[in-house]
A protein has these predicted regions:
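Short coil/loop residues immediately preceding or within conserved phosphate-binding loops
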Residues: 37, 107, 132, 141, ...
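A short glycine-rich, aromatic-capped structural motif
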Residues: 183-253, 266-281, 318, 385, ...
Length: 464
């Protein structure tokens, strides 16, 4: 077969492949030629604009488009940051038109206010000004970057709006500030505990003055400064959280169960609490804080960021409503406390305990569900009651001679007893319910539990 093509001025070519045997006659029906298209060559400055014809997408500039002849066609040209251009064309068959357009920028005003004021503003990689200047920019997306020596650069995609001045305010952060802005202020452990981030500033005083009512000899005044930010659980570890680690019974007191899922776990030793912390660390693939050997705690790695018990200094700082208060918020200048302000030895426990707070009723004769009472000003629950709490430190009495603050104290390196802090459902005396009260022990008690803590970063991490 051969391809046969018929052409005629002003009409589209007609082509068809024809096959015929020798000696045969092939009859072809009458051929009606179709008028040729009109042609439009489209270009824009800048190029890359979108073309629509009669609402239908026809590519981007530069482009050549073919249109039905002798018909009106509506051409629209779009490009981000430029005004839309619209044109109508009507061309005879076979006619060609060149349409070259210079697009008009659509401008929006942007005022960028930055602290510090000597910061420079870069748009799409080009330096355009300093803070406070009004930038006139095409109304399309731009990458804005703000730079200043000693600060982390700020990047943001902005889209100016025509006839509308935008005001953008930016506070640049130092590397240190940027780092801490990226650290979550609250985390949830795989054990179910919610922990809050704390970054204590300045120094505070542990202990109590000699004249304070209820003060004991081991509450020596000492200045302390905590420099390592840490996470601290908002609530005490519950029975059901501890059961994830191992089987355990918190038992009962006076015929009342201490073993409900949301009651704080009790009747565990300091070592059992530390082993739980290591289990939780391994569960989250964190370096354990406590050193173990044959299921015994033999030491600690103070550079580790795994879970641990709070240090006595951390506990004391977290429990205070201010830097110097030695009484809980519930008991400050108010003893006996108001009803249901915390879980202490109340009249509902009179059949269980020898001593209770007269005319005080918190509604719980033994341990309460954790978080049953209002938190302190730092958002922490039950620091002054419910159960007393194991802390990390060995017990000791340290005299702070002079005016120098101890930095991140962790207690003696060794000892026989561990420190217990906070009041409990068994405590009725104001001496035991003050925040400076220090108890000691090693063995399990039915009014002692714990809460978990962890450092944010290792001790040897270099400053940013």
């Amino acid at each position: 077969g051969e391809v046969v093509t018929i052409t005629y001025p002003g009409y589209k070519p007609w082509s068809k492949k024809l096959s015929i045997n020798a000696g045969d006659i092939l009859k072809i029906p009458e051929i009606e030629l179709v008028p040729a298209d009109s042609i439009v060559d489209l270009s824009t400055m800048p190029s890359g604009a979108t073309i629509t014809i009669n609402g239908e997408y026809r590519g981007n500039t530069p482009n050549t488009v073919y249109l039905d002849a002798d018909k009106k066609h509506n051409i629209s040209i779009f490009l981000n940051g430029y005004f839309t251009q619209k044109h109508s064309v009507l061309l005879a068959s076979g006619k060609r038109k060149n349409l070259s357009l210079e697009l008009i920028p659509s401008i929006g005003a942007v005022k960028v206010l930055v602290s510090p004021k000597d910061s420079t503003i870069w748009i799409d990689g080009k330096l355009l000004g300093i803070t406070g200047e009004i930038l006139q920019l095409p109304s399309r997306p731009h990458l804005m970057e703000i730079k200043n020596s000693g600060y982390v650069s700020y990047k943001k995609v902005i889209t100016p709006q025509p006839q509308l001045e935008q005001i953008i305010k930016v506070q640049l952060l130092t590397k240190e500030e940027h780092y801490w802005a990226s650290i979550p202020v609250e985390i949830t452990s795989l054990g179910g505990q919610i922990l809050k981030l704390f970054k204590p500033e300045g120094t505070f005083t542990m202990g109590a003055p000699r004249q304070e009512v209820g003060r004991r000899a081991n509450e020596v005044l000492r200045k302390v400064k905590i420099t390592r930010p840490f996470y601290l659980a908002t609530k005490e570890v519950t029975n059901d959280q501890y059961w994830q680690y191992k089987q355990h019974s918190s038992r009962h007191a006076g015929g009342k169960t201490l073993d409900r899922p949301k009651q704080p776990v009790v009747s565990i030793s300091w070592e059992q609490a530390a082993l739980y912390c290591n289990w939780l660390s391994r569960k989250e693939k964190l370096l354990p804080f406590y050193i173990e050997s044959a299921n015994k705690i033999t030491g600690s790695n103070i550079s580790a960021t795994g879970y641990r018990l709070p240090t006595e200094a951390e506990w004391a700082w977290a429990a205070r409503s201010s830097g110097s208060d030695n009484q809980s918020e519930n008991l400050h200048n108010n003893f006996p406390p108001k009803d249901k302000s915390g879980n202490f030895a109340d009249i509902s426990a009179a059949n269980i305990l020898e001593s209770v707070i007269p005319i005080y009723n918190d509604g719980h004769s033994t341990t309460a569900t954790v978080g049953s009472f209002n938190p302190n000003k730092k958002g922490l629950y039950d620091l002054d009651g419910n159960v007393a709490e194991w802390v990390n430190d060995y017990y000791g009495i340290r005299f702070n001679l002079g005016n120098t603050a101890e930095i991140d104290p962790m207690g003696p390196n060794e000892g026989e007893l561990k420190v217990i802090r906070g009041g409990s459902w068994r405590h009725s005396d104001i001496a035991q319910l003050r925040l400076s009260f220090r108890d000691t022990g090693n063995s399990a008690r039915d009014d002692v539990g714990f809460r978990v803590a962890r450092y944010v970063e290792s001790k040897d991490k270099k400053s940013r």
